[in-house]
Design a protein with these regions (language model features):
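Short beta-strand/loop motif that positions the catalytic acidic residue
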Residues: 218, 224-226
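Conserved acidic catalytic loop of the alpha/beta-hydrolase fold
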Residues: 83-101
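Conserved alpha/beta-hydrolase "acid-adjacent" motif
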Residues: 231-237
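Short glycine-enriched nucleophile-adjacent loop
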Residues: 110-121, 127
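Conserved HGGG/HGGXW glycine-rich cap/lid loop of the alpha/beta-hydrolase fold
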Residues: 6-74, 78, 92
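Flexible "cap/lid" loop of the alpha/beta hydrolase fold
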Residues: 127-159
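Alpha/beta-hydrolase
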Residues: 158-213, 220, 240
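Catalytic active-site module of serine/aspartate enzymes centered on a nucleophile-bearing elbow/loop
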Residues: 248-284
Length: 284
């Protein structure tokens, strides 16, 4: 379904699992897990079949496509900013009546979640930041691509991520396969409704952003997950995120032998499930 979040902007939303379940003579409300997809030019179909689908046994799962992506309204590039996407989380929750969501931000979605935490620190119950970074360290990322895919992959990554769109095809050929340990079935990406203009537009903000200062004011528990072999969000960058968060609220999990897709979605469901079950909402 498409939901109007204000200003005539419609976001595509999909809901799995019951929000209320019978418990004796009454009904108990379950936590809501709101999942923010990566890309940014991808869509929420990337979560399907990742294992995160199975979390409906502990929460109502809500996925949506960001403004500018997938089945949501694409709108004007002037609206494709982290501030807008972060505020869309709150707008969507207001419309759907979601209070104190558990927010999972994957890859680019984790950048949105970090900005959301900075702008709306009291809004979530808890947050998962999976396979994401607070800033783009081009030299580090290029070195990681080179280590896994050779010097050419490293050079292409450095130039493409800096904004050279003429290397998009080379990046897709040499670098994207390194996002996973095992080959990814072609159908997974074929299902995505891609907006390549969104990637090109966000590259400017990505190269300039540094989200670390906004994480200092976080007031809820945060689970940070990274992959040992992730070239686009290396473990050093994941640790950078964790170190920017208040020590008493952050927990970090480093997945050995995992690349980006594994750390951002495919292998994280057991850790997310435990994190949900720790929520006061699950215990009420």
């Amino acid at each position: 379904m498409r939901v109007d979040v204000g200003g005539g902007v419609r976001l595509f939303v999909d809901v799995d699992g019951a929000g209320w379940i019978p418990e004796g003579q009454s009904m108990r409300q379950r936590p809501t897990l709101l999942m923010l997809h990566g890309g940014p030019a991808m869509d929420s179909s990337l979560f399907r079949g990742s294992g995160l689908d199975e979390l409906t046994d502990v929460a109502q799962v809500v996925v949506y496509d960001h403004r500018g992506a997938g089945r949501s309204d694409w709108r004007s590039p002037q609206e494709w900013t982290l501030d807008t996407w972060a505020d869309d989380v709150v707008r969507l929750c207001d419309v759907l009546g979601i209070v104190k969501p558990i927010v999972l931000g994957s890859s680019f979605g984790g950048m949105v979640a970090q900005r959301y935490l900075a702008r709306h620190p009291g809004h979530p119950d808890r947050v998962v930041l999976a396979g994401t970074s607070a800033r783009l360290d081009l030299d580090l990322v290029a070195a990681c691509f080179a280590a896994r895919g050779g010097d050419r992959a490293g050079a292409v990554a450095q130039q493409y991520l800096a904004g050279d769109q003429s290397l998009a095809a080379d990046y897709d050929e040499l670098c994207l396969p390194l996002y996973a340990i095992e080959p990814v079935e072609a159908e997974r990406f074929a299902r995505v409704i891609a907006n390549p203009d969104l990637d090109a537009h966000f590259t400017k903000e990505w190269n300039a952003m540094d989200l670390r200062s906004g994480l200092a004011q976080v007031t809820c528990p945060v689970l940070v997950i990274g992959g040992e072999l992730d070239p686009i969000c290396p473990l050093e960058a994941v640790r950078d995120v964790a170190n920017a968060l208040p020590p008493g609220l952050v927990r970090i999990i480093e997945l050995q032998g995992a690349s980006h897709l594994e750390a951002a979605a495919d292998d994280i469901a057991p850790f997310v499930r435990d994190f949900i079950l720790e929520s006061s909402q699950s215990q009420s």
